[in-house]
Structures are given as structure tokens and as C-alpha cells.
Swiss-Prot record:
Comment text on domains: The presence of a 'disulfide through disulfide knot' structurally defines this protein as a knottin.
Keywords per UniProt: Disulfide bond, Ion channel impairing toxin, Knottin, Secreted, Signal, Toxin
Keyword Ligase among UniProt keywords: no
Signal peptide coordinates: 1-21
Keyword Secreted attributed: yes
Disulfide cysteine pairs (residue numbers): C31-C45, C38-C50, C44-C57
Any one GO cellular component localisation term in the record: extracellular region
Name of the protein in question: U12-theraphotoxin-Cg1a
Main location: secreted
Tissue specificity: Expressed by the venom gland.
């Protein structure tokens, strides 16, 4: 019984993971979240900016350091 439940949960995990991967490939995203690669044609979401050094979306600091 425990094995059946475990296999069922594992199957659901793989199913939803596969569906999420297909959705990401089909539709283009309008913005990118923290830690994702960005460029001029792949902008970061609100609250982040594209690091010129690394090319990743990072947190935006208002006052700077």
C-alpha cells in the first residue's frame, strides 16, 4: 500500500513537471525572475534588473551601496 501511494505521487510529480516544461517551451515569457539569464530582448521582471557583469536578473536596490 505504501509503495502504491509513493509510486502514484512520483507519477504525478513527473506528469506536472513534464507539463510545466512543455508550457515554458511553447509560450514566450514576458519577463525573467531572479537568477535567470537576461539580455536586452529578455527583460527582468519588476523589482529586478539585468546585471551587466553576469547577465542574470538580480534584486534591484533603491539607494545603491
Amino acid at each position: 500500500m505504501k509503495t502504491s501511494v509513493l509510486l502514484f505521487m512520483l507519477g504525478l510529480t513527473f506528469l506536472f513537471d513534464g507539463l510545466a516544461a512543455i508550457n515554458l517551451q511553447e509560450g514566450e515569457r514576458t519577463c525573467y525572475d531572479i537568477g535567470e539569464l537576461c539580455s536586452s530582448d529578455k527583460p527582468c521582471c519588476s523589482g529586478y534588473y539585468c546585471s551587466p557583469r553576469w547577465g542574470w536578473c538580480i534584486y534591484s536596490t533603491r539607494g545603491g551601496r
